[in-house]
Curated annotation (Swiss-Prot):
Name under which the protein is recorded: Bifunctional polymyxin resistance protein ArnA
Task performed by this protein: Bifunctional enzyme that catalyzes the oxidative decarboxylation of UDP-glucuronic acid (UDP-GlcUA) to UDP-4-keto-arabinose (UDP-Ara4O) and the addition of a formyl group to UDP-4-amino-4-deoxy-L-arabinose (UDP-L-Ara4N) to form UDP-L-4-formamido-arabinose (UDP-L-Ara4FN). The modified arabinose is attached to lipid A and is required for resistance to polymyxin and cationic antimicrobial peptides.
Binding locations of (6R)-10-formyltetrahydrofolate: R116, I138, E139, R140, A141, D142
Site feature (Raises pKa of active site His) residues: D142
EC number of this enzyme: 2.1.2.13, 1.1.1.305
Keywords: Antibiotic resistance, Lipid A biosynthesis, Lipid biosynthesis, Lipid metabolism, Lipopolysaccharide biosynthesis, Multifunctional enzyme, NAD, Oxidoreductase, Transferase
Record text on subunit structure and interactions: Homohexamer, formed by a dimer of trimers.
Site positions per UniProt: Transition state stabilizer: N104
Residues that, per the record, bind UDP-alpha-D-glucuronate: 395, 400, 434-435, 462, 493, 527-536, 614
């Protein structure tokens, strides 16, 4: 019986995949592709033209995961889905449309080089082998079981274009051999070895900047990885851009400074190790393709001149304003941005205990203050900085019922003032929404663009936080329609060191895990609200901060006007399970003998713990399709590891408190 397929394809490997399916006897019910981007050099064959010539129904929707398209695909009743170099991630609902599975052809030997542009990355990294992989698609990008692979040798002279040609031939051969076996159901699957996995993100033209302090071999690899039809490697000669299309490595650099012109015929440049001969290139985006010697003449180069590359190109750091910089997200994010080397961080908070380690950094600027009082400083720094993160909020459940008006005043009114400053001065705002905006949504996975936001009755004041955040989300979205650049991110139960303080837990104003650890530290029963049956998806702060840093980076403006869940759907656990794992690790911890015996678990009602205005939700699980698609991001840290390092941090804090009181 003929197998029916729905295909998602782009590029000439998309054409290769379609041809292979037809040759293997598959019925193609529909093909989904992308409209060509006029800004992109489309050197590859057209899926649209092939489908038109073959009479195959073709679509190019903006969002193939939209419910309308999902329903149309379900109506086709496909046996298989295939993705051949399609550029968007297929969501879980879409993958489930195929009766016999969904499969992707990836341009590397998985699990290595997951992600974008693998053919370019293997050349940048000087690899000698790559290949193609046919694998089953799961929610995580490029992570499903492998059905078949074919290796491709990378020659020292290969460029991205020549390697692409090799991969296209390998893909054709692999699909020719594999597709008939897949239709028969006799193609075995092998799980990927996660310990061998590597992930690479999308490349942009700016990534072609040459750093002459690097070894010549690395620069040669960069040149061949991004040469035509890609934008090319480049450097600066005075105020002019020099694009390098072809180069070769020559031993030695005469002991000269990196970037120095060693000769003009040939045009030879000193590198951190050895030197690079620029064989062909052009001056500026519209210049002629010239030999290196003529380029030297055109650019007025002489022996001893210096070319500017990545190491000596002056570029102002992006100024990021973090309000609430001493908080859990703020201090971890500041550390990550400063480590990156491209950012200058300005911060305000009412304390600084969590950021003492950062104060010595010359690119970190801190002022102790209150956003509700220091309005002139606040407005000035919104005007001065490039990206604004208002992280100041009351975000602990007991305060929602205990101080609802204070929650509204700070979380909504004060933050609205900051948003309006961003509108006034044309600044980009990265705003922390919350997973709580989904409220009592019944969807199995909470989707940023489709899930309903459901809250309880007015007399349940715990929803004041959720609706304050939701209203700000809607205000920001409306300002976005008038030109405000924004991204909304929704953290799902981030955990890790410096989450909050044991003192906060003592007055009930902390996150759940801190409360649980406090009971272990003090030898009191662990209180499980309503039995601890509530499920959450816990996210390691390092995973979360990496996603947030990519939002701030915002390559190609991909995050503008977007809402992004940042959570780990694989780390779902009930509060009881969280407590049990904490107890297991606590009993095995080297510091265990310093603390009292475990006092057991005690179930309590939410009303007695939080007050009359509380109402809980049974589960809170994110869809992270947007994060995968926009950020090339995937959480990797397991819950057990996150619990371990969070516990270790608080146990050491407890001992420091004890020593200070002695």
């Amino acid at each position: 019986m003929t197998s029916k397929a729905v295909v998602f394809a782009y590029h000439d490997i998309g054409c290769t995949g379609i041809e292979a399916l037809l040759n293997a006897g598959y019925e193609i019910a529909a093909v989904f592709t992308h409209a060509d981007d006029p800004r992109e050099n489309t050197f590859y064959a057209s899926v649209a033209r092939l489908c038109a010539e073959r009479g195959i129904p073709l679509h190019a929707p903006e969002d193939v995961n939209h419910p309308l398209w999902l329903e149309r695909i379900r109506q086709l009743r496909p046996d298989f889905l295939f993705s051949f170099y399609y550029r968007r991630l297929l969501g879980a609902e879409l993958l489930a449309c195929a009766a016999r599975g969904a499969y992707n052809l990836h341009g590397s030997l998985l699990p290595r080089y997951r992600g974008r542009a693998p053919a370019n990355w293997v050349l940048v990294n000087g690899e000698t082998q790559t290949g193609v992989t046919l694998h089953r698609m799961i929610e995580r990008a490029d992570a499903g079981p492998i059905l078949a692979q074919q290796a491709v040798a990378i020659d020292p002279e290969d460029t991205a274009l020549s390697l692409h040609g090799k991969l296209r031939k390998a893909a054709g051969a692999l699909l020719r051999d594999s597709l008939p076996l897949l239709a028969l159901g006799v193609l075995p699957e092998v799980e990927q070895d996660e310990s061998q996995a590597s992930h690479f993100g999308r490349r942009t033209p700016a990534d072609g900047l040459l750093d002459w302090h690097r070894p010549a071999r690395q620069l040669y690899d960069l040149v061949r990885a991004v040469t035509q039809p890609y934008p090319g490697a480049f450097c600066q000669v005075g105020e002019q851009k020099l694009i390098v299309w072809s180069a070769e490595v020559v031993a030695g650099n005469h002991g000269r400074e990196p970037g120095s012109v060693l000769s003009c015929d040939p045009l030879r440049i000193a590198c951190g190790e050895d030197s690079l001969v620029l064989r062909f290139g052009q001056r500026g985006e519209r210049g002629l393709y010239l030999a290196g010697t003529q380029l030297a003449t055109e650019l007025g180069l002489v022996e001893g001149a210096r070319l500017r590359g990545a190491a000596c190109s002056p570029q102002r750091r992006t100024r990021v304003l973090i309000l609430g910089v001493n908080g859990f997200i703020g201090n971890h994010l500041s550390e990550r941005l400063l480590r990156d080397g491209r950012y200058e961080v300005h911060g305000m908070d009412i304390g600084s205990d969590a950021i003492e380690r950062l104060k010595a950094d010359p690119h970190f600027h801190f002022v102790e203050g209150d956003i509700g009082i220091h309005s002139e400083w606040l407005e000035y720094h919104v005007k001065k900085c490039d990206v604004i993160l208002p992280l100041v909020a009351i975000a602990t459940p007991i305060e929602y019922t205990r101080n609802p008006l204070r929650v509204f005043e700070l979380d909504f009114e004060e933050n609205l003032r900051i948003v309006r400053y961003c509108v006034k001065y044309g600044k980009r705002v990265v705003f922390p929404s919350t997973s709580e905006v989904y409220g009592m949504c019944q969807d199995p996975d909470f989707d940023e663009d489709r899930s309903n936001l459901v809250v309880g009755p007015i007399n349940k004041q715990r929803w004041i936080y959720s609706v304050s955040k939701q209203l700000l989300d809607r205000v920001i979205w409306a300002y976005g329609q008038q030109g405000l650049r924004f991204t909304l991110f929704r953290p799902f139960n981030w955990m890790g060191p410096r989450l909050d303080r044991l003192d906060s837990a003592r007055i009930g104003s902390s996150r759940a895990i801190t409360q649980l650890i406090l009971h272990l530290v003090e030898g009191t029963p662990i209180r499980l609200v309503d039995g601890g049956a509530q499920k959450r998806c816990f996210t390691d702060v390092d995973d979360g901060i990496e996603a947030l840093a990519r939002i701030i980076d915002n390559r190609d403006g991909r995050c503008d006007g977007q809402i992004v869940n940042i959570g780990n759907p694989d780390n779902e656990a009930s509060i009881r399970q969280l407590g049990e794992e904490l107890l297991r690790q606590f009993e095995a911890h080297p510091l265990r003998a310093q603390f009292p015996p475990f006092a057991g678990f005690r179930e309590v009602e939410s009303r007695s713990f939080y007050g009359d205005g509380y109402q809980d939700v049974a589960h809170r699980k994110p869809s992270i399709d947007n994060a995968r698609r926009l950020l090339d991001w995937q959480p990797t840290i397991e819950l057990r590891e996150t619990i371990g390092k969070t516990l270790d941090f608080f146990l050491h804090e407890a001992l420091r408190e004890r020593e200070a009181q002695a």
